[in-house]
Amino acid sequence: MKKLIILVAGISFFYGCKKSDAGGGGTTADTYLNTKAASSWNYHETNSSSGTPQNSDYSLVSTSRDTSINSKIYHIYSFSYGGSQYLAINGHDYYQYDSVPGALGQIFERLYLKDNINANSSWSQQIAVSIPGLPVTIPVDINNKIAEKGISKIINGATYNNVIHVSTTISSVAIPSASLTSDINSYYAPGYGLISNTTLVHLDYAGVKQDVNIVTSLNSASLK
C-alpha cells in the first residue's frame, strides 16, 4: 500500500514538476505543439511542496529527432538539466510519453489535451499500475476537463489569446477520496503550448502524508 501511495504522489509530480507537458507552439500556428528544430522555451518553477518555496529556471529545446511509439510519431525535446521529453499530436489529441516518478520504472502515455472539444467537456484515463507483492494491478484514474476555452491570460507580463484551460484530478479506488485531494490546472496557448501550470495535491493515508505544491510559468520563448 505504501508503494501505491508513493506512486500517486509521483503521478502528481508528473504534472507539476519540470517534466510536465511543457513545450508546444504548434506544427502550425493554430496548434499547441511545436516540432520545429531549435525552438526553445524558458520556464520558471516554484516548488513549495516542502513548505519553503524553491525557485528554479530551466529551458526546453526542440530537437530535430522523432521516434515512433504506439503507432504515433513522438517529437523529442531536450531539457537544460538533462533528459528528454516525448510529445505527440494525433489529429486534435496531444500526448506525453514518459516514466512517472515513483512508478517503479513504468512508462505511461498520457492524453493531456484535446483542442477540438467544447468547454466543460471531459475525458479520463485509467492507468493500470503493477505493485510488487500484489497479484493484481491497481487502477489510478486521471480525470481531465476543459475548464475554459478561448480565453486571454497574462503570464509574466505577456498576453496570450485563445488559451485552453485544462483542469485535472487524480484518484484511485485504493485510496479514499477524502484522503487524496488534487487540483491541477494547465493553460495552453496556440503558438506556445504550455504557458502555466499549478499542481496542488494533498495525500494523507495509511500513515503517509504528502503534499505537492508546484507552480510553473513561461518566461520567454523563441519559436522557429
Predicted regions and their residues:
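Positively charged n-region of N-terminal signal peptides that target proteins for export
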Residues: M1-L4, K18-K19
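C-terminal motif of bacterial Sec signal peptides marking the signal peptidase cleavage site
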Residues: F13-G16
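Conserved functional acidic sites
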Residues: K18-K224
